[in-house]
Amino acid sequence: MTELTLKPGNATLADWRAIYRGAVPKLDEACRPKIKASAEAVARIVAKGEPVYGINTGFGKLASVRIPAGDLETLQRNIVLSHAAGVGEPMPVAIARLMMALKLASLAQGASGVRPETIDLLQAMLANDVIPVVPAQGSVGASGDLAPLSHMTAVMIGVGECFTPHGRFPAKVAFVSHGLEPVTLGAKEGLALLNGTQFSTAYALAALFEAEVLYQSALVAGALSTDAAKGSDAPFDPRIHLLRKHRGQIETAEALRNLMAGSAIRESHRVGDERVQDPYCLRCQPQVMGAALDVLRKAADTLGTEANGVTDNPLIFAEDDTALSGGNFHAEPVAFAADMIALAVCEIGSLSERRIAMLVDPALSGMPAFLTPKPGLNSGFMIPQVTAAALVSENKQKAYPASVDSIPTSANQEDHVSMAAHGARRLIGMVENATAVIGIELLAAAQGCDFHQPLASSDALEAVRKLVRAEVPHLDNDRHFHPDMEKAIAMVRSGATVRAAGAVALPSIAGAA
């Protein structure tokens, strides 16, 4: 596994993407003095005996209850065990790993009062690929992602289960086999570990990285569909988009121009085409996809900031031994970012489905009905378009903003919450749905371009069509469609479609690949 030096507070989206893809984070040693100073500040606060929330008091509605000095370790263990109350399927290992790395970076900024040895255990778990089993349901996004982060922390004290390279095991068994030892949590450490937005942020970042591949694949499929339908590249003329000035629209139009450059199919109808304008699903790709790109970039900016922040409570300022209670655990920024990603993903899939519908309709595409040479005897792409419609409809239902909901918790002490966890968790499924739609479009567009042979598309799009044809032959007669669709979906999901387009530069959402 690749090792990545993690600089707390200064990590890039490319860093987080690399960790999501499997890189192992190793803390920059420059953060050590701040970690040590923060832990020492907590020790001095404890010694003073004054009431400080989360250090020597109860939690939430029970904040007014003072805890004796002899019970402080028990207090931290109790909050972890009592708050590990999530339900549902475990979060995916890659996202759980990212969550742990986000928590590691937050604690290492020296504002949480966590001792070096506790932080070192979290880092060692990542290095050994010992990943807590974390039920994915149970967070309302304030006060932080309490339940899921408690499940993560429970493993650190020897409770719960882990995923390891060798399978799923009780935490204590996994620790022994990897030479790890559970930690006894000190004052404030349990609260610092389980309070924060890292669960929601990890899910949102994972979806962002997958949405980047989705967006680029949709551009490739859209360009191929434009050629399949003998659509015009005139709507991608830069002069149109420079007048409107939206960056995403300008870059999307440029990418579409570059993808189609040199297409013999396009040149075959440049002169004498009786169609004056294409349907919106072709003509307005820069406007729709460009808007999606801009929204995804805004979400990326928000999540990049959040990933570099400290979001537990209270926060420790070692320079004057101050513990300040605030609300950095409130995940409203993450909830808004997740809602933005949901809207963009929904529209990317929606536009793709409209192109599929256009291609299978002979009145719009000029090609055989449902892209089959013998319509009637064969149904061709009839039901794949129905499947695409079903997936798009499901995404539209899921795209309703999560951030507008709130249910008070903790006896109304926590009376407004973000619902960021739900908003972020739904995104991976939405991206999967949209990925399937793009895969179906890829098959339909390749089929359409086949009908124009011997005319060929551009070099970039021909490479994509040949990639498809290497796995899925032209559809002459009806056959079992599902395996073909799965192969095309896998091409989109893996980024193979984008790579096949070669040197054509496609806009990026989250920094360098």
Curated annotation (Swiss-Prot):
The modification 2,3-didehydroalanine (Ser) is found at S143. Contains an active site 4-methylidene-imidazol-5-one (MIO), which is formed autocatalytically by cyclization and dehydration of residues Ala-Ser-Gly. Keywords: Cytoplasm, Histidine metabolism, Lyase. One of its GO terms (biological process) is L-histidine catabolic process to glutamate and formate. There is a cross-link at A142-G144 (5-imidazolinone (Ala-Gly)). Pathway: Amino-acid degradation; L-histidine degradation into L-glutamate; N-formimidoyl-L-glutamate from L-histidine: step 1/3. Disulfide bonds: none annotated. Its EC number is 4.3.1.3. It holds the Pfam family Lyase_aromatic. It is an enzyme of class 4 (lyase). GO terms for cellular component: cytoplasm. It catalyses: L-histidine = trans-urocanate + NH4(+). GO terms for molecular function: histidine ammonia-lyase activity. PANTHER family: HISTIDINE AMMONIA-LYASE. Belongs to the PAL/histidase family. This is Histidine ammonia-lyase. The gene is hutH.
